[in-house]
């Protein structure tokens, strides 16, 4: 389901078209899942989000939740999942013959969504009612004791709310900088990744690291706990 939303910030407006919104309802809640279709193998990166480099998916969720809250003012709107789906037609290569069921399982594994899911058991069950150990459709795995494995892409409801508020504040900061005329090239380096590698404007932006005074931002590779703590501190400042 597509939606088209505009949200204002003074004289700045964000206009976006969300690829897909799925909702599930009960008597008191509306659970919202947002999916962004990608031709490449996009991965959700909480650190990139913190640094303002990967805001789009959460912006979509914020818009979708606002839309649903207007439709259902008497219900609590719950973020269920923020997911990327890689549009692909995968092939399976194997040295041994597989059954049709085994082939389908491997294809599903290649097409599994990437992102973050609300860790609330009610939400996870609505997203994959047949989940036992490893989901074929969402980035969630369970250990033998029923807890989520470290490979799972999960956030608690409180963490999802914090991320939502942080991104909304980040967008407003970016909007103010645009209005203030701050448009200087400000590339970054994060581990082996750097902004200039695939930048479509690198031939015209004039940034040259060999010239004194031209330095890329050095971004730390932080763990989830530290990232959430820093987001919380930012929101409390």
Segments (PLM) and residue ranges:
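Single conserved hydrophobic/aromatic residue that forms the stacking wall/gate
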Residues: 2-13
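Conserved catalytic cores of phosphodiester-cleaving nucleases, focusing on short active-site segments
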Residues: 14-26, 31-43, 60, 199
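Short small-residue beta-strand/loop micro-motif enriched in glycine and branched aliphatics
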Residues: 41-46, 150
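Short alpha-helix boundary/capping segments
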Residues: 45-55
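Short amphipathic alpha-helical face segments that pack within enzyme cores
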Residues: 55-63
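Metal-dependent nuclease catalytic regions and adjoining charged, substrate-binding loops involved
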Residues: 63-198, 213-215, 219-237
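Cys/His-rich metal-chelating microdomains
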Residues: 202
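Short, non-ligating residues that shape and space the ligands of small metal-coordination modules
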Residues: 205-208
